[in-house]
């Protein structure tokens, strides 16, 4: 089991000592990744806090967060942390397929993740599920996608020029990228964004 101990050791300037924490793992490993969630309460007596469930799979770790009728699945790709720059870093968590370092998908409780319209993608070039492409780019990007009614809001960063597509089952009335309206280019359930 994972456990930690408090150790007293010299300070950086060697003029005193201070306490450090040493983590001990159940097996010898050459790298460790962790996930920390900090929840700030709005009031001292607040009781309605998000419920978090730790999750993991082949080459990924993550959380399922449930709060006020909404589920957010957060995934961290353990292959895409920058050490394997020219190696394949694709993972397949819960039916998704991506090369993103981190991604999250939010959807109403009682519905399926495949019908989600809100996504966060950190340093990724694609997000797929089955035969559906939810996001595709020739470059790795940072993306936030939020669909409300017939409007699609996108925040995209990471490259000076953007050429990407996003899945939308219906043609939106308007598309905004980084708070600027762009023409809606829609074909075969895909919205094209070129900046």
Where are these regions (language model features)?
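CBM-like, beta-strand-rich accessory domains located in the C-terminal region of large
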Residues: 1-168, 173, 177-195
